[in-house]
Amino acid sequence: MMNLISDNLKRSTGEILWNGQEILSLGRKFRKVLGFMPQQQGYYDRMTVDFFLRYLSQLKGIPKKQADQEIRILLQKTNLSDVCHKQMTSLSGGMKQRVLLIQALLGDPKVVLLDEPTAGLDPKERIRIRNLISEFSQGRIVLLATHIVSDIEFISDKILLMKNGKLVRMDSTEELLMSVADKVRELPCDPEQLPELESRYKVGNVSRRQGQTVARLVGDDLPPESKNVADRLTLEDVYLYYLEGSQ
């Protein structure tokens, strides 16, 4: 979907509208309001951070004075001012992700596409990137694709669940959690029972509590002896119910 919106993939049918107008007919006018952070890190190894961002701002047609101001502010907000003269190849994975987030925000785009922005990062860097996205999302449409549910649980207004290229459901976090309130239960079991449970149900977390194995089951027809956990639902439960396996 992101490749279609960014016109990196040609459409065979359908339409994509921005303010009621087809984006292909808008051409450059739409590209000027679009920022894109692809999943694969793309940069020039020997360029410094500052030079890389200025180079991309020129490609975007951003006036030099505006680019200078935006780069300075964004480097400060992402805590990268101290490394702005270092080569891209010398940065950590998290720093590179922050630089790529900056380039997506150059020109003050109204639509920002972020494809797996925290992939491969440690928990600390993932939280940092997530918080930056939350801060920069004010006044923008941010479309974030991720398999890490914690990335979106606290910052998204709407969550789109897609499977095999088709939209399965679109709702807020609260509405999605409510939709599986009676679809998630926990069942104490012996470890030897897990293979059988996995063959019959969608099994989420398996935990040990007070010396006992507890399996989290997701689905429509769950064992009556299992315990409802409607007060402790997560987006992982939503993911398992709607997207894992056949439904």
Residues of each region from the PLM?
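Conserved ABC ATPase "signature" region
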Residues: 54, 58, 65-83
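Conserved ABC ATPase signature
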Residues: 87-91
